Amino acid sequence: MSERKLFTSESVSEGHPDKIADQISDAILDAVLSQDPDAHVAAETAVYTGSVHVFGEISTTAYVDINRVVRDTIAEIGYTNTEYGFSAETVGVHPSLVEQSPDIAQGVNEALEVRGNADQDPLDLIGAGDQGLMFGFAVDETPELMPLPISLSHKLVRRLAELRKSGEISYLRPDAKSQVTVEYDENDHPVRVDTVVISTQHDPEATNEEIHRDVIEKVIKAVIPAQYLDDKTKFFINPTGRFVIGGPQGDSGLTGRKIIVDTYGGYARHGGGAFSGKDATKVDRSASYAARYIAKNIVAAGLAKKAEVQLAYAIGVAQPVSVRIDTFGTGIVAESKLQEAVRQIFDLRPAGIIQMLDLKRPIYRQTAAYGHMGRTDIDLPWEKTDKVQALKEHLA
């Protein structure tokens, strides 16, 4: 009998407390970048019942009305009713942002490679904003080259938000979570969905029966291809029996607490650094995007069915200290040759990544819910496959 394996990933909606915090942090980043593309930003947010605290470091010439950005973001998510215990108009906003440390700025603004060197490459000017390791991943399980469990999990909570905002399911409230368990065959190909868990906040009048019916018919069956569902697929819809109190009234939220949701749902490794609220000189963010860009182009080029890319940096140094590629035995060329090609084709210095992916633009708020990778609903530069031909030619 062939061996079957299960793998599970989860996602959360834009109304989840941690995701509210991520979206506020990225909305502040976008507001700053729209005026000052060269700003350095590290904006953290904490949310809880009736209160939002924004803190961190910013170096910029821009003026941003933090209070307005916070309230507008909360309203766009859907927290406009005081019954939710957290409302855009009544929430208390407490900003506490200071200037970036000059010790850090020294290494970011002038990388080790150019200090005391008159003959300098402009792209060597920016050093990494911190040490660290970052991962990117791609696999041919879905058209967007993402693992199927996280792809479906994101689509489920995004569908809930669409139905809530359109009014088609009027009793839905903003907070929600999804979880999908996929069964794989002995060749690591997804064959069916074993279990779907959805917890969605709702008005008190909604019955469990109508929630169960609507979620299965209008969410699960609308999102998950019929080929993956069978009579053995298990559905757990609001398994606690009631989910009226939610959002920051139910749990506090912090920026950067959903890093696995933001990436590959646990299917690939993670370096530990969060994304939201950070400008692109922070390699936690920009190098993770670059690593995804590399991995996706490798798989799109047919050079491997699965690819994981690790990049690592030293603070204040432009060039990565290491580049590693793992194709898990699915590659058609040696990994050493892939690594050589990647170093030739992709500029992995922070300034090179920023230029390559055009990361000084205010594009980040849209990434702060429903995943930073594999998005098909928005246009993100690290999701392009425009290096496929260059990789093929280099390795020919």
Curated annotation (Swiss-Prot):
One of its GO terms (biological process) is S-adenosylmethionine biosynthetic process. Its cofactor is Mg(2+); K(+). GO terms for cellular component: cytoplasm. It catalyses: L-methionine + ATP + H2O = S-adenosyl-L-methionine + phosphate + diphosphate. GO terms for molecular function: ATP binding; magnesium ion binding; methionine adenosyltransferase activity. Residues 100-110 are annotated as: Flexible loop. It is found in: Cytoplasm. Pathway: Amino-acid biosynthesis; S-adenosyl-L-methionine biosynthesis; S-adenosyl-L-methionine from L-methionine: step 1/1. It holds the Pfam family S-AdoMet_synt_N. K(+) binds at residue 44. ATP binds at residues 16, 175-177, 242-243, 251, 257-258, 274, 278. It comes from the Bacteria. L-methionine binds at residues 57, 100, 251, 282. Keywords: ATP-binding, Cytoplasm, Magnesium, Metal-binding, Nucleotide-binding, One-carbon metabolism, Potassium, Transferase. The keyword Electron transport does not apply. Binds 2 divalent ions per subunit. Binds 1 potassium ion per subunit. Mg(2+) binds at residue 18. Its EC number is 2.5.1.6. The keyword Cell division does not apply. Homotetramer; dimer of dimers. Catalyzes the formation of S-adenosylmethionine (AdoMet) from methionine and ATP. The overall synthetic reaction is composed of two sequential steps, AdoMet formation and the subsequent tripolyphosphate hydrolysis which occurs prior to release of AdoMet from the enzyme. HAMAP family: S_AdoMet_synth1 (MF_00086). Belongs to the AdoMet synthase family. This is S-adenosylmethionine synthase. It comes from Streptococcus gordonii (strain Challis / ATCC 35105 / BCRC 15272 / CH1 / DL1 / V288). The gene is metK.
